[in-house]
Amino acid sequence: MDKKYGICHLCGKYAELTFEHVPPKSANNKKRAKLLTGREIFDTKKLREGKSLKYINQQQGAGNYTLCQECNNNTGDWYAKEYIKFANEIGYLLTNKIDINSAKGIWLDTNKLYFQRIIKQILCMFLSTIQPGYAMEFKDIREYVLNKNSTEFNNKKYRISMYLLKNYEISHSGILGLLLKDNGETKIKEVAIMNLYPIGFILEIDPSEKNIYDTTDITKFTTLKYDELQNVVMTFTITEKYSLHNFTDRFIKENSNRSDNNGK
């Protein structure tokens, strides 16, 4: 196979790129994958003409050549193993502890996971799925991920939300600019979405005070130390609202012109 060279989405250096599995291979990503990207789902001409969406068949699992060897090795050693434990625990709960057809969510109670490592793996995957030019703009996120001991994360500029998927889906949107109406004013909201069965994530840039419907804000874990175990008791919603299969305008409708919980 020909070597692939380009800009590493994490360190920013021009180097030979290695294949970054998104999600990690042992997190339900070992077999051939059918990947749906944001570029395809927002092909308005195709949608108007009623044409079928085109999937990318990936023989070695979902992912792409986005990280240099050093960054791939480091993040794999530092973060991926903990994310795999987390994703597999969620998968076990969904398939063995609830009725997936009737349950609306799960309750997670654990003190055995290093959530800072999980968060940094999530951010590394976002960087790998974001368009190369955009990835370089997130220098603060890249520096946070590159330093395993860093606890400095700008939670005013970014919010990371999580939800659970009922059906199998591997898809990612890249950075989307959505036109939303807020109190009569039209604003552009930038988000990135990853559906990595059994978990989905949304990264918001310059988030509003309102959380996204049916998601759990996990940004607070960014301030944990690398070796810090955290007792986590949280509820995660099972939803298909942010599936890229049916995304279109639902996100816009449900997250525009909403009141905060206090009615303001």
PLM feature spans:
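Short, well-structured alpha-helical interface segments that form or flank functional binding sites
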Residues: 17, 63, 117, 186-189, ...
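Generic structural signal of hydrophobic/aromatic residues within well-ordered alpha-helices
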Residues: 32, 38, 71, 75, ...
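Catalytic cores of phosphodiester-bond-cleaving enzymes
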Residues: 2, 52-133
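Glycine-rich loops and low-complexity Gly/Arg-rich segments
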Residues: 43-44, 92-95, 227-229
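C-terminal, charged low-complexity interaction regions
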Residues: 131-264
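Short alpha-helical interface elements
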Residues: 33-36, 47-48, 92-96, 100, ...
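An N-terminal structural lobe/cap that precedes and organizes the functional/catalytic core
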Residues: 1-77
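Low-complexity, polar-biased intrinsically disordered regions enriched in Pro/Ser/Thr/Gly
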Residues: 43-49, 53-54, 97-100, 176-183
